[in-house]
Structure formats: C-alpha cells, structure tokens
C-alpha cells in the first residue's frame, strides 16, 4: 500500500507527490512514488525523483531511486537533497538499504549517490535480456545506501 507523505521539504527544495503507482506483478515492478522537485516557495518544477518500494531482481539494475534535474538547475545538489528527503518515505516502508544505480560515465549522478554516504558495490554489466539493455544501457554503477547512517549535507 502506498500511504507515504504527499509533501516533503528541507527549506531549500520541496517534493510534491505527483503519482503513486501500485505494483505491476506481470512486469515484476514494485509500487512506485513519483515526486516533483520544486525550489521552496516556487511553483517551478526543477526535476523529479522516483522511489520504488521493494526488493527484486529489477532493482539490481534500475535501483530503488531514480532522479532527474532540469539542466538549468544542475550543480546545486538538488538531487542529493531530494534523495535525503525521499529517504523518509523509504523509512516509512522499512526499506533499508536502498539500491541506487547510475550510468558509470555520469559523474554528477555518482556524486549524488556518494555525498549522502552510499557505498559503491561495483560497476555491473546490464544483462542482454533486461529492458535497460534494449534502451542502450550496457553498464550500471550499483550503490547501497543506508539513509539512517547518512552524513549531514555539506
């Protein structure tokens, strides 16, 4: 059941729930929250973050978290802030640790994983039978993140 918070804020960014999708067992897809990321006090959507609630083989490739920040708002650690906020929803569902994956070539995304204390488990090949392979992905960094042990933002 998706019964997490609809609004989260840290005083800099706020997350607003845009969609709560139930599980799709035929796709082996867990329930998912999609939050819009906004600058506090603004109606301008600067990105989105998704939290997939569950553990399965799919999460090893796609991870529990996915995030995107509009190009014009990158470089201000907004994705990291959103990750820290959505960790509250993960805790609500007793989801710890979180698996976070990213493109090995995306240094900014790797830093977004590392700054709050995620541990790199390795760089893994995407299996040819996985949907991400058909989308062009060949490798993923896989991180494990224990949000309750995260260092404070700097």
Language-model features: locations:
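Acyl-donor (CoA/ACP) binding surface of acyl/acetyltransferases
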Residues: 1-23, 29-154
